[in-house]
């Protein structure tokens, strides 16, 4: 659907950190560096964050890239093929706990509104956009995102061809 393509373009736009038209390992490194700086995290946490975010590239996207950067068309076409595969859900969900760990800066196994705002800042978005996305994902309305809520919302973002509240998982659609 057009909505699904728009969601994939949104994800690509958020992850193409240097806006050079391709997703590369450098985008994930830059994201980790900005996040560590914005959240003023300790050096050991910054290392875990770097490992988590570069792990998304190393473990999941490098196969699509074939050792190079991934342009938007290649990314969208790869995702189209992936979501048709019944086993794709585990591949799509694989990086989500890594992102969760990156966003859960105080390591309490929940993401707070403030942490989600930092996440939006890390993606280069206005932090004031975060509450609407946070509320859409916080299905039990307890003011915290659990790993389960985060993974379900992230998986739905990629796998659901229709409209859902999780379409704003990575912020407003581009």
UniProtKB/Swiss-Prot annotation:
Residues reported to bind Ca(2+) 1: 16, 18, 20, 27
Q: Give the signal peptide, or none.
A: none
InterPro entries referenced in this protein's UniProt entry, alphabetically: EF-hand-dom_pair (IPR011992), EF_Hand_1_Ca_BS (IPR018247), EF_hand_dom (IPR002048), EH_dom (IPR000261)
What Gene3D superfamilies does this protein map onto? EF-hand
GO molecular function terms attached to this record: calcium ion binding
The residues that the entry says bind Ca(2+) 3 are 138, 140, 142, 149
Ranges where the EF-hand domain occurs: 3-38, 55-90, 91-126, 127-160
Q: Name one Pfam family in it.
A: EF-hand_5
UniProt keyword Metal-binding, yes or no: yes
Residue list for modification N-acetylserine: 1
Q: What keywords is this UniProt entry annotated with? A: Acetylation, Calcium, Metal-binding, Muscle protein, Repeat
Q: Which parts of the sequence bind Ca(2+) 2?
A: 104, 106, 108, 110, 115
What is the role of the protein in this entry? Like parvalbumins, SCPs seem to be more abundant in fast contracting muscles, but no functional relationship can be established from this distribution.
**Anything else of interest in the record?**
The sarcoplasmic calcium-binding proteins are abundant in the muscle of arthropods, mollusks, annelids, and protochordates. This protein has three functional calcium-binding sites; potential site 2 has lost affinity for calcium.
What is this protein's name?
Sarcoplasmic calcium-binding protein
The protein's organism comes out as: Hediste diversicolor
Lineage per the UniProt record: Eukaryota, Metazoa, Spiralia, Lophotrochozoa, Annelida
